[in-house]
């Protein structure tokens, strides 16, 4: 991500040249269109700022998704090599109520990875999930890769487009 915002407060200056120092309470974000779960107590929205920084949005509250060093993380990229194009996009996020007390204990982020053979146009999808703390910190030790259906219930949406949420 190009987002340097959270580090501006460390240095006390406008590093990205947008005319102000970063304030998570005064940031404009846009919802990611692939995040369609909007109901239930755990519903949150995956959002992005103008520089590609990722946020978990619930109501008017934005939680920036960061690593353990408080730096913005990036999951959106594309690379073409050896006749194949690999694309990754942050797809959806949902709150997880681990102890059934009607409060969000953590979040789960889904990242879609697409591999396209540029000769045959054949496409294969794989899914990555990562848990994020309620403070927005990525827990890399929870990273998984595999089929979308395994995470549809947690994310409360149909990720693989088969018309149903697998459980």
Regions found by a protein language model. Name each.
Residues 1-167:
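Long, low-complexity, Gly/Thr
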């Amino acid at each position: 991500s190009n987002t340097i915002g959270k580090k501006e407060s460390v240095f006390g200056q406008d590093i990205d040249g947008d005319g102000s120092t970063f304030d998570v309470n005064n940031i404009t974000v846009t919802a990611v269109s692939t995040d369609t779960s909007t109901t239930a107590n755990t519903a949150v929205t995956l959002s992005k700022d103008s520089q590609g920084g990722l946020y978990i949005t619930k109501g008017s509250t934005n939680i920036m998704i960061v690593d353990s060093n408080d730096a913005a993380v990036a999951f959106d990229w594309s690379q073409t090599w050896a006749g194949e194009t690999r694309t990754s996009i942050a797809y959806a996020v949902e709150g997880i109520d681990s102890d059934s007390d009607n409060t969000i204990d953590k979040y789960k982020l889904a990242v879609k990875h697409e591999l396209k053979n540029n000769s045959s146009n054949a496409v294969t999808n794989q899914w990555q999930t990562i848990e994020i703390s309620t403070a927005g910190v990525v827990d890399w030790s929870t990273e998984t890769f595999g089929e979308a259906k395994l995470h549809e219930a947690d994310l409360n949406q149909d990720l693989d487009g088969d018309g149903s949420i697998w459980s």
